[in-house]
Amino acid sequence: MAAAAELKLLEKSLGLRPGNKYSAQGERQIPVLQTNNGPSLTGLATIATHLVKQASKEHLLGSTAEEKALVQQWLEYRITQVDGHSSKEDTHTLLKDLNSYLEDKVYLAGYNITLADILLYYGLHRFIVDLTVQEKEKYLNVSRWFCHIQHYPDIRQHLSSVVFIKNRLYANSH
């Protein structure tokens, strides 16, 4: 999914009125937001953070200094590790690492949903939707997290719902 489409989904989930004008620059199609009253903003994380502040939902950026740093870390991870990776091998490495991280966590940063969860959900959707039942079981922690995030009101919107089975097929899928 193109970054502009993700930013429009984010706008809607934040309750902002549509109307921002997005474009993309360069070979990597880096998103650009043309603001009405200032310079244009460049980059997915920068624009998304701006939208969160514009919607007065700063809690999505983390509530403590550590959570804020973790949110930024995961936004960087989204841009450097998720975007641009399309090979099956890259995807499985990414999911394996994320699965380990989420082993004892409900959210990426802290005890509540953050912008990091939302943008990583949008970034991973294209991969998760194509996973087999066996692959979803292999990445059980990612599947649990993804299923949880997709059921938040206004997050999934028009994206296809990914079905996860409740009973495991294999006892030792790890």
Swiss-Prot record:
**What does the record note on quaternary structure?**
Part of a multisubunit complex that groups tRNA ligases for Arg (RARS1), Asp (DARS1), Gln (QARS1), Ile (IARS1), Leu (LARS1), Lys (KARS1), Met (MARS1) the bifunctional ligase for Glu and Pro (EPRS1) and the auxiliary subunits AIMP1/p43, AIMP2/p38 and EEF1E1/p18. Can interact simultaneously with MARS1 and EPRS1. Forms a linear complex that contains MARS1, EEF1E1, EPRS1 and AIMP2 that is at the core of the multisubunit complex. Interacts with ATM and ATR.
User: Disulphide bridges in this chain?
Assistant: none
- Any Pfam family matching the protein: Arc1p_N_like
Q: What is this protein called?
A: Eukaryotic translation elongation factor 1 epsilon-1
In this chain, where does the modification N-acetylalanine occur?
Answer: A2
Q: Which organism is it from?
A: Cricetulus griseus
Is this entry keyworded Protein biosynthesis? yes
**Which residue numbers delimit the GST C-terminal domain?**
50-173
